[in-house]
């Protein structure tokens, strides 16, 4: 089922998320719905808060980007209860957008590589290091689990420039090519 994507201004996007267990929800159905929603929205990542769930879960699919970003080859994963345990000292800057903030894209500075510990959809633990665009996608989605959106990471002057757009999104005065909830 295609779920509505919660827009900027929804309290769940700022709420702390909780760890999940195999018993805490119907994970198989939720993941199926999230993958379907992500595909229709044509995004490369979707976090549970973006569909109204304050839980520590996000999915990524960077496979469409692999031609330009080789590190995204076969980069389709589920991250449950993730924890970024290491960040590189080197930073990179890249323009980011977000399904919860349609029509806004801004340059965001992030660590160039990260190491993350997480559980997959079978609740098997992994510790992996990512760099480049794959690391950026993970950090963007991870921010949602921490109650942040990418505009929190832009310069104060740039935030002033997008303030009206953010206000309009929060009021539902925005067009998106996918189902939304304000």
Task: Pin down the residues of each PLM region.
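Active-site rim/adjacent substrate-binding subdomains
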Residues: 1-139, 144-182
């Amino acid at each position: 089922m295609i779920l509505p994507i919660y827009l900027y201004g929804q309290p769940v996007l700022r709420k702390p998320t909780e760890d999940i267990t195999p018993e805490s929800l119907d994970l198989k159905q939720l993941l199926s719905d999230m993958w379907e929603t992500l595909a229709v929205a044509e995004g490369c990542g979707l976090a549970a808060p973006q569909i109204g769930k304050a839980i520590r879960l996000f999915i990524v699919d960077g496979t469409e980007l692999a031609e330009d970003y080789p590190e995204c080859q076969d980069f389709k994963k589920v991250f449950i209860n993730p924890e970024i345990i290491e960040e590189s000292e080197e930073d990179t800057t890249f323009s980011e957008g977000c399904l919860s903030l349609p029509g806004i894209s801004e340059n965001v500075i992030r660590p160039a590589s990260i190491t993350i510990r997480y559980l997959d959809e079978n609740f098997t633990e992994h510790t992996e290091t990512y760099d480049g665009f794959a690391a950026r996608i993970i950090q963007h989605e991870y921010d949602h689990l921490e109650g942040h959106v990418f505009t929190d990471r832009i310069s104060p002057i740039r935030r002033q420039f997008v303030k009206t757009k953010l206000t309009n999104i929060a009021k539902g005065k925005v067009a998106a090519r996918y189902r939304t909830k304000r």
